[in-house]
């Protein structure tokens, strides 16, 4: 999986929330993952997109958004022929260093493994 990722929060010095721009190219997906404490807003800026939340498929057009609560499994993906541009904002910030996580935490965050593709791209 290859998602072009810009960390806006880091660039702006934000410490209490995360904000990223994701460009998801055709046939690509973000990781299927969840956060223990962070809620995230997924705003599709360009393209048409799909986001699976707890097994349910949500289809979005430009400027559509979805709020994903903590604990929910989420995965945006691109099964179209055009790039998608997403703005993802979440709080509170959670550690993202998977190298320091134990097996149980990794299994919670990535229930299908960190490289699982959605069925639409498999």
Question: Model-found features: residue ranges?
Answer:
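Short, charged/polar surface micro-motifs in flexible loops or helix N-caps
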Residues: 13-15, 25-28, 48-50, 57, ...
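Short acidic-glycine-tyrosine-enriched beta hairpin
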Residues: 55-71
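A generic "binding-loop/recognition-motif" signal
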Residues: 37-38, 56, 72-73, 82, ...
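Short beta-strand His + acidic residue motifs that chelate non-heme Fe in jelly-roll/DSBH
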Residues: 32, 51, 68, 74-80
């Amino acid at each position: 999986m290859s998602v072009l990722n810009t960390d806006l929060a880091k660039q702006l010095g934000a410490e209490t929330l995360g904000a990223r721009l994701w460009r998801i190219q055709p046939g690509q997906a973000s990781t299927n993952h969840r956060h223990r404490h962070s809620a995230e807003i997924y705003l599709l800026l360009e393209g048409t997109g799909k986001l699976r939340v707890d097994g349910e498929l949500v289809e979005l057009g430009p400027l559509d958004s979805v709020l994903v609560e903590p604990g929910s499994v989420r995965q945006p993906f691109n099964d179209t022929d055009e790039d998608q541009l997403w703005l993802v904002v979440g709080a509170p910030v959670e550690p993202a260093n998977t190298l320091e996580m134990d097996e149980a935490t990794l299994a919670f965050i990535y229930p299908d493994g960190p490289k699982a593709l959605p069925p639409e791209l498999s």
